[in-house]
Every structure is written in structure tokens, then in C-alpha cells.
């Protein structure tokens, strides 16, 4: 066991003691991350749940190192989250995060040692830490010492956070950025070295070409010299035609040739030295070329590795982009799910409110049934009012006749008063002329005074006040009723009644004229007494009728107030129901959109149809109930309009009968108008 990997083998021996389903005897079996994930699930099943364990792919044990790297990455991220969230620890920067790629590709023991050290920290700090500590104590002393040293290193590299913050580790984006930066640096360095080597190769090739050219030139010169030497050796005549003589020792030719030979030897030695130097340089250049070729091969291998690293970086970038998109989609789905839950709650509230509205509609139906009974009473009151109107018409015709009679009596009374004044004047004259007959004249005058004052005593002061009050009210009613218009049918009825009354008036006038001619011959005082009695009886009957009409008017006004209150409450309810229906439809539409956005593959047509059917049923029920209430309210409003129109017609008839062409006494005898009519019209 080496000292460098002693801690790793100690941690591996401890890890072998765990009861796991996956194989975990060596580094190759641990490199897929399945055994580590099962161990974490065994340590803290609440944090490393079965759903998390299902994400670890057990098929990564083969040659696919990317699957192993993804499993190890999930394990490392889960461990860091466990340290930050559950244990409330933050790993400092001096503790290097395990290199997942090195473990997955090369089964690096140092990186695997760091990962096992983190797993050991999870085991010692979990809920079942006593049992795991006992298992560690059962190991050998050397293993225990190494495990304790690993725990101490882990404790020194962690610090506890008071706020339970999250571990600050390199994300996928930073990792891809670092890999990209390293790849770019390596690529730039390799390109620089390759350019330098290419430049050196180019220079050496130039030098080699120059040396080869020099070598060929020297060889050519050597051949020329040898040829010249052979020629000179065999020729006895020089170029200038001078005889050179035989080649013998001591001769001039021999000496000249000897001298030339020495020069050639020296040149040959120099050329051989240069050749040796060139050979040495060529060998050096060849060795440099071989070294440069090896360097170029290494650079090509590193470029291939760099290309693979680039591909991996691109894959990581794509995976990070996909992860970002998935995280954004997950956040949107979470928000939509929250909105869907809110919509569910809102729909429940709306259902409860709709149930309340159904109960209220049932109460309104019961109230409508109760008011149906009052409808019959209103019809009875209508019939009674019509009977009273006919009676009132009869009484008004009688009253008109009596008014004409009263006019004739007033004219007679005025004539009698004039005669009285004349008699008073004559009395004064007779007082002066006949003083002796004073007593007799006084007796006669007293009788005449009693006769003349009887007509004035027939009218008491209360009657005069009442007549004045009635006249003022009649004027007010005429002014208030001048701008009102009745319905067409009621106007036709009123016109027909007016024509009947005019015919009755004609007949009454003819009768009055005949009676006036007949009464001129009779005693006026007796007739005035009879007419006054008849007028009193008619006034009493008229007051009784007015009291009855006022009672009916008060009852009708109370019923109208109730009907108006019910109409206002019904209108408010209708507005509330419409507002809630609009809100309900909006909520249903939003719920449909949320369901479609959450999972568009699932056909949510059934739920939408069910909601639409429920909404249609509620709308039909509310429409039927509201239509019944509207019919009832229309009937009551029509009856109320009929009563008001009849009253207006009666008042208009009374106003026509009480025209301005009457005398003072005729206006005084008119019946008092109903006080409630003006108040009801104002309402």
C-alpha cells in the first residue's frame, strides 16, 4: 500500500463494509456512481430519496464515460446540497471539488479519494451515525488512523453557517467557461510552438539546400581539377605552345606541377574539412528535424485531444442550455400550477356563492308566491275602485245638478237682498215721515229682517273655511295636473266619460231651467231650506266617499312601496349575479389555459365541457327564475300603472267639472281632493 493512496485504500476498505446491492470492491466499480448513490440513500433516505436514486442510471457501468460522469455529477451535487441544507456546512475553497471527469474517464484515485471523503462525512453526520462509527472502530488501527485524518481534513475545510446558506460551488456554466479558456490557451500555445517549429524547419531546409549546392559545386570543381591534372600530366606542350619538357625530378615542369599539387591538396583538405563540418551540421539538422517531427506529432495528438475537449465543451454547453431552458420551463410550470391552485380555490368559492345564490333565488320564488296572493287582492281593489269611480261619476252628476240649483238660488238671494236694501231705504224715509206709526213699522221691519238673514245663516263659518280650502287645493291640483299625460286607452275612456257627462250636463241644464221657471212662482225661502238640506246630505256622502278613496290610496301606496323595494333588491341581485357570472367565465377560461399549458398532450376537453355544462345549467336556472320574477313584476307594475291612470282620469274629470265658469257658491260646494294623490305622484 503506497503512502500517497493510503487514505484512498483505507476509505475503500471502510466502504466495502457497507451492505450495498451494487458492486463496490475497486475503483472501476465505484466510478459509475451507482454504489455511492445507494450508500447515500442508505445514510439519509429523507434527503437522498428513492426518486433521486432512480435518476442514477445503473447502465453506466460500461464504456460510456459520459453516463458515468452524469451519475457522479448528480452524486456530488446531492452531497453538496446535503452539506449545505441539512448539515448547515459550507465547504471552503481549500477543499477542491472532486473532478468527475477524471473519475469517469481514468478512475483517478485522488479524485475518488475526495469523493469518498465527502461520503464519509455524510455517514458520520447522518441519523444512524453511531452504527457507522462502531463499524469504523472495528477496523484496523492503520485504517482507523487514515479515516480519522480524512475526517479532520474535512472538518478543517468546512465551516458551519448560522443562516444555513447554500454551498458555493462551480456551476455548469463556470465549468464550461474554464474548460473553454483552458482549451483556448492550449490551442494558442500549440499554434505558437507549431509556427516556431515550422520556421525552424524552413530555415534548416534552406541551409541544407545551400550546403547541397556547395557540395555539388565542390565536386564539379574537383572533377575539373582532376581532368586538368590528367591533361597536364600527359601533355608535353603548354597552352602557349611552349614545350614543357619531360616530367622528371628537378625539372621546371616537375616543380611547377609539384607546387600546383600542393595547392590542390591544401584546397582538398579545406574542402574535406568543410564537408565534415557540413556533415556534422546535416546530422544535427536531421536530429533537430526528428525532434521537431516528434514535437509535431505530440502537438497533433494534443490538437486531437483539444478537439475532443471542444466537442465535450460543446456538449456541456448544449446540456447547460437545455438545463436552463428546462429550469425556466419548470419555474413557469410551478407558477402555472400555483395559479391553477388559486383558480381551483376561486372556483370553489364561486360554487359556494352560486349555492348561496340558488338559496336566495328559492327565497325570492317563495316571496313571489306570497306576492301572487296579493295580486288577487289588488284585482279586488281594482274592481272596488272601478265601482267607486262609477259611483263617483253618479254623485258628480248629482252634484252638478245641485250646483245649478244653487246658482239659481244665489241669483234669487241677490234679488232678495236688493229688495231688502230698497226696503231699508224706504224704511228710513218712512221713519222721517211717519213718526207716529213707529211701533207698527218696527214690527213689520223685524219680520222682513228675519226673512232676509235666514239665507245668510244657512251657511256656517266652518263651511266657508272648508270651501276656501277646497278651492285652493283645486287650483293647486289644476296647476300640477296640467303637464301630465295619461295612456292612450285611459284617455279614450276619459273622453267617452266626458261626452257622457256633457250629455248629462245638457239634460241637467234643461231640467234646471225648467225648475227655475217653476220656482219663480213658489216661495224662495222654503226652496232654499230644502236645497241647503240636500247640499248637506250630498257633502256628507262626498266626504264618506273621499275617506274610502283615501284608505284605498294608502293601501295601494304601501303595496307600491313594497313592490319598488322588491324591484330594487331584485335589480341589485341581478347585477351581482351578472358580475359573478362574468368572473366565473374568466376563471374557467384561465383554468383551461393553465391546464393546456401544464400538459398539452392530455386532452382537457372533458373538464372544460363539464364546466361549460355546469355554467349553462346555472344560467338556464337563473334565467327561468328571473323570467318568472320579471313576469310577476311586470304584472304588478301594469296594475299599478292602471290604478294611477284611473286616478288621474278621475282627477281630470273633477278638474273639468270644477271649471272656472262656476259661481262662488258652486265652487264652495265642491268635494275636497285627495291629499295622497300628489304625494303618490311625487313618489
Swiss-Prot record:
Compartments, record wording: Cytoplasm, Cytoskeleton; Endosome; Synapse
GO molecular function: dynein light intermediate chain binding; microtubule binding
PROSITE patterns tied to this protein: CH (PS50021)
Ranges for domain Calponin-homology (CH): 5-123
Signal peptide: none
Gene3D superfamilies noted in UniProt: Calponin-like domain (1.10.418.10)
Coiled coil: 135-440, 484-594
InterPro entries assigned to the protein according to its UniProt record, in alphabetical order: CH_dom, CH_dom_sf, Hook_C, HOOK_N
Pfam families: HOOK, HOOK_N
Gene Ontology biological-process annotations: cytoplasmic microtubule organization; cytoskeleton-dependent intracellular transport; determination of adult lifespan; endocytosis
Swiss-Prot/TrEMBL keywords: Coiled coil, Cytoplasm, Cytoskeleton, Developmental protein, Endocytosis, Endosome, Microtubule, Synapse
Domain of life: Eukaryota
Gene Ontology cellular-component annotations: centrosome; endosome; microtubule; synapse
The protein's role, per its UniProt record: Involved in endocytic trafficking by stabilizing organelles of the endocytic pathway. Probably acts as a cytoskeletal linker protein required to tether endosome vesicles to the cytoskeleton. Involved in modulation of endocytosis at stages required for down-regulation of membrane proteins that control synapse size. Not involved in synaptic vesicle recycling. Required in R7 cells for boss endocytosis into multivesicular bodies (MVBs). Has a role in regulating adult longevity.
Domain notes per entry: The coiled coil domain mediates homodimerization.
Quaternary assembly: Homodimer. Interacts with microtubules via its N-terminus.
Family: Belongs to the hook family.
Protein name: Protein hook
Organism of derivation: Drosophila grimshawi (Hawaiian fruit fly)
Annotated gene: hook
Amino acid at each position: 500500500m503506497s503512502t500517497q493512496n493510503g487514505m484512498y485504500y483505507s476509505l475503500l476498505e471502510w466502504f466495502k463494509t457497507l451492505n450495498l446491492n451494487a458492486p463496490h470492491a475497486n475503483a472501476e466499480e465505484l466510478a459509475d456512481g451507482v454504489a455511492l448513490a445507494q450508500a447515500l440513500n442508505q445514510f439519509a433516505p429523507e434527503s437522498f430519496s428513492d426518486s433521486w436514486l432512480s435518476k442514477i442510471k445503473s447502465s453506466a457501468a460500461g464504456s460510456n464515460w459520459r453516463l458515468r460522469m452524469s451519475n457522479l455529477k448528480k452524486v456530488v451535487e446531492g452531497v453538496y446540497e446535503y452539506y449545505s441544507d441539512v448539515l448547515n456546512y459550507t465547504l471552503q475553497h481549500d477543499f477542491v471539488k472532486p473532478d468527475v471527469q477524471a473519475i469517469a474517464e481514468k478512475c483517478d484515485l485522488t479524485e475518488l479519494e475526495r469523493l469518498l471523503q465527502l461520503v464519509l462525512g455524510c455517514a458520520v453526520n447522518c441519523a444512524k451515525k453511531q452504527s457507522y462509527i462502531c463499524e469504523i472502530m472495528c477496523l484496523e488501527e492503520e485504517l482507523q488512523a487514515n479515516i480519522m485524518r480524512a475526517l479532520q481534513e474535512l472538518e478543517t475545510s468546512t465551516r458551519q453557517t448560522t443562516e444555513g446558506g447554500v454551498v458555493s460551488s462551480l456551476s455548469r456554466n463556470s465549468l464550461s467557461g474554464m474548460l473553454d479558456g483552458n482549451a483556448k490557451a492550449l490551442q494558442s500555445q500549440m499554434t505558437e510552438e507549431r509556427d516556431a517549429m515550422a520556421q525552424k524547419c524552413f530555415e534548416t531546409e534552406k541551409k541544407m539546400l545551400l550546403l547541397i549546392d556547395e557540395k555539388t559545386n565542390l565536386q564539379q570543381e574537383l572533377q575539373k581539377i582532376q581532368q586538368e591534372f590528367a591533361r597536364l600530366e600527359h601533355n608535353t606542350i603548354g597552352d602557349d605552345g611552349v614545350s614543357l619538357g619531360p616530367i622528371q625530378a628537378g625539372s621546371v615542369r616537375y616543380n611547377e606541377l609539384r607546387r600546383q599539387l600542393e595547392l590542390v591538396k591544401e584546397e582538398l583538405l579545406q574542402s574535406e574539412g568543410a564537408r565534415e563540418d557540413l556533415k556534422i551540421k546535416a546530422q544535427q539538422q536531421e536530429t533537430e528535424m526528428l525532434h521537431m517531427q516528434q514535437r509535431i506529432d505530440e502537438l497533433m495528438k494534443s490538437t486531437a485531444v483539444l478537439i475532443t475537449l471542444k466537442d465535450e465543451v460543446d456538449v456541456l454547453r448544449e446540456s447547460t442550455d437545455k438545463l436552463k431552458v428546462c429550469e425556466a420551463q419548470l419555474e413557469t410550470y410551478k407558477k402555472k400550477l400555483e395559479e391553477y391552485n388559486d383558480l381551483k380555490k376561486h372556483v370553489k368559492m364561486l360554487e359556494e356563492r352560486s349555492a348561496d345564490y340558488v338559496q336566495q333565488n328559492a327565497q325570492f320564488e317563495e316571496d313571489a308566491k306570497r306576492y301572487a296572493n296579493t295580486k288577487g287582492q289588488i284585482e279586488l281593489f281594482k274592481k272596488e275602485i272601478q265601482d267607486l269611480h262609477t259611483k263617483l261619476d253618479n254623485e258628480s252628476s248629482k252634484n252638478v245638478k245641485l250646483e245649478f240649483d244653487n246658482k239659481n238660488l244665489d241669483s234669487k238671494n241677490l234679488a232678495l237682498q236688493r229688495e231688502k236694501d230698497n226696503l231699508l231705504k224706504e224704511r228710513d224715509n218712512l221713519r222721517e215721515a211717519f213718526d207716529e206709526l213707529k211701533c207698527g213699522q218696527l214690527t213689520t221691519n223685524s219680520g222682513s229682517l228675519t226673512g232676509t238673514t235666514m239665507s245668510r245663516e244657512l251657511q256656517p263659518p266652518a263651511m266657508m273655511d272648508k270651501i276656501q280650502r277646497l278651492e285652493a287645493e283645486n287650483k293647486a291640483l289644476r296647476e300640477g295636473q296640467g303637464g301630465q299625460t295619461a295612456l292612450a286607452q285611459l284617455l279614450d275612456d276619459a273622453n267617452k266619460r266626458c261626452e257622457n257627462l256633457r250629455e248629462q250636463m245638457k239634460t241637467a241644464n234643461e231640467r234646471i231651467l225648467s225648475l227655475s221657471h217653476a220656482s219663480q212662482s213658489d216661495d224662495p225661502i222654503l226652496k232654499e231650506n230644502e236645497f241647503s238640506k240636500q247640499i248637506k246630505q250630498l257633502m256628507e256622502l262626498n266626504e264618506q266617499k273621499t275617506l274610502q278613496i283615501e284608505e284605498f290610496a294608502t293601501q295601494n301606496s304601501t303595496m307600491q312601496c313594497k313592490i319598488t323595494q322588491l324591484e330594487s333588491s331584485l335589480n341589485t341581485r341581478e347585477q351581482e349575479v351578472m358580475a359573478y357570472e362574468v368572473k366565473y367565465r374568466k376563471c374557467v377560461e384561465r383554468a383551461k389555459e393553465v391546464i393546456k399549458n401544464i400538459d398539452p398532450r392530455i386532452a382537457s376537453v372533458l373538464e372544460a365541457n363539464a364546466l361549460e355544462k355546469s355554467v349553462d345549467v346555472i344560467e338556464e336556472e337563473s334565467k327561468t327564475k328571473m323570467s318568472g320574477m320579471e313576469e310577476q313584476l311586470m304584472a304588478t307594475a301594469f296594475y299599478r300603472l292602471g290604478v294611477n291612470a284611473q286616478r288621474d282620469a278621475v282627477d281630470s274629470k273633477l278638474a273639468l267639472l270644477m271649471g272656472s265658469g262656476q259661481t262662488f257658491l258652486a265652487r264652495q260646494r265642491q268635494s275636497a281632493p285627495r291629499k295622497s294623490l300628489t304625494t303618490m305622484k311625487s313618489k
